[in-house]
């Protein structure tokens, strides 16, 4: 699609979203568009520091978790000693960027609003790790904490998965992996999915939306996919194209959040319509005027804070 035919997104977004887009960090170097992935990761971490400031203070603990691929770092956020459940958080970043620091505020707010223990899993990024390594690391971490729940004083009788963007795909894929392979890590009470991608290769929103402002042009999406997958056949795997999985039975309750001007919005709409058509418990909420990744900006955006509260409320309602 010719770029000129796309929607004038930056003219259409909400006033608070425009404020975020126009917020400058004078001490930040330019985005290393032609740099290495390592340089882009470093920039992303630096850029997110401003947006992570002022998050709620709470007890935090770090553990290295053994997996067949090696040790994976995890971080526990404990808002209270008697947590009713444990939420595993998977960060976004196109499978190639992001870590526990870039999504620190999101995890802290989710823990605060849900009053549940939140465990961030620093899964190995691509292209160093190829599908399905990240999912297997996440599942290994769930199993580890389930086995060590008493020693670590966490409630693993009821768990959930949450994630944004690529992390949302990993969250739902991990829940389906546990179901399909009959792995017991506690009851999966809910899955919280903010503006994820779930397997569409083309859509109306992918045509109309996406640009330099969100890093989600068709070329960008192809680059993330090529970094993540091992081969072309993986595109049809039921743990990458989740619409190739069985979404008609035993899907945990899903909170599906969409951003109005996100090229991935149709992924969320299709997921919701599929689950709803088969009487699987789910809720869809569209956040008007927002861009992909708006969840990061709760320091400045009431809508981002609202989206986190909505997800937390949905999860606690399942307990």
From Swiss-Prot:
Its main location: cytoplasm. Its EC number is 3.1.1.-. Optimum pH is 9.0. Changing residue 164 to A: Strongly reduces enzymatic activity. GO terms for cellular component: cytoplasm. PANTHER family: AB HYDROLASE SUPERFAMILY PROTEIN C4A8.06C, ALPHA_BETA HYDROLASE FOLD-3 DOMAIN-CONTAINING PROTEIN-RELATED. Displays esterase activity towards short chain fatty esters (acyl chain length of up to 8 carbons). Able to hydrolyze triacetylglycerol (triacetin) and tributyrylglycerol (tributyrin), but not trioleylglycerol (triolein) or cholesterol oleate. Negatively regulates MalT activity by antagonizing maltotriose binding. Inhibits MelA galactosidase activity. Homodimer. Interacts with MalT and MelA. Not essential for cell growth. This is Acetyl esterase. It comes from Escherichia coli (strain K12). The lineage of its organism: Bacteria, Pseudomonadati, Pseudomonadota, Gammaproteobacteria, Enterobacterales. The gene is aes.
């Amino acid at each position: 699609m010719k770029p000129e035919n796309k929607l004038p997104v930056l003219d259409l977004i909400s006033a608070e979203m425009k404020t975020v887009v126009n917020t400058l960090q004078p001490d930040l170097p330019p985005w290393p568009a032609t740099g290495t992935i390592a340089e882009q990761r470093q920039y992303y971490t630096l850029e997110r520091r401003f947006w992570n400031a002022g998050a709620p203070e709470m007890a935090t603990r770090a553990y290295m978790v053994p997996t067949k691929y090696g040790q994976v770092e995890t971080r526990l956020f404990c808002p209270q000693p008697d947590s009713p459940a444990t939420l595993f958080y998977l960060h976004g970043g196109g499978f190639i960027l992001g870590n526990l620091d870039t999504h620190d505020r999101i995890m802290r707010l989710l823990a605060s609003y849900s009053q549940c223990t939140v465990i961030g899993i620093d899964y190995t990024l691509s292209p160093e790790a190829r599908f399905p390594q990240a999912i297997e690391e996440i599942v290994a971490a769930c199993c580890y904490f389930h086995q060590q729940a008493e020693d670590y004083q966490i409630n693993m009788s009821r768990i959930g998965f949450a994630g944004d963007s690529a992390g949302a795909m990993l969250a739902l894929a991990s829940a389906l992996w546990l179901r399909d392979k009959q792995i017991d890590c506690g009851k999966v009470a809910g899955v919280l999915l903010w503006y994820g991608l779930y397997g569409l290769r083309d859509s109306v929103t992918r045509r109309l939306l996406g640009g330099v402002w969100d890093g989600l042009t068709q070329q960008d999406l192809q680059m993330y996919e090529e970094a993540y997958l091992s081969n072309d056949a993986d595109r049809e795997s039921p743990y990458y194209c989740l619409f190739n999985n069985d979404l008609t039975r035993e899907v945990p309750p899903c909170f599906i959040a969409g951003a109005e001007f996100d090229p991935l919005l149709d992924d969320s709409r299709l997921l919701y319509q599929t689950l709803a058509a088969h009487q699987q418990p789910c809720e869809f909420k569209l956040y008007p005027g927002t861009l992909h990744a708006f969840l990061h900006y709760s320091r400045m955006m009431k809508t981002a804070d609202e989206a986190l509260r909505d997800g937390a409320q949905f999860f606690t309602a399942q307990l």
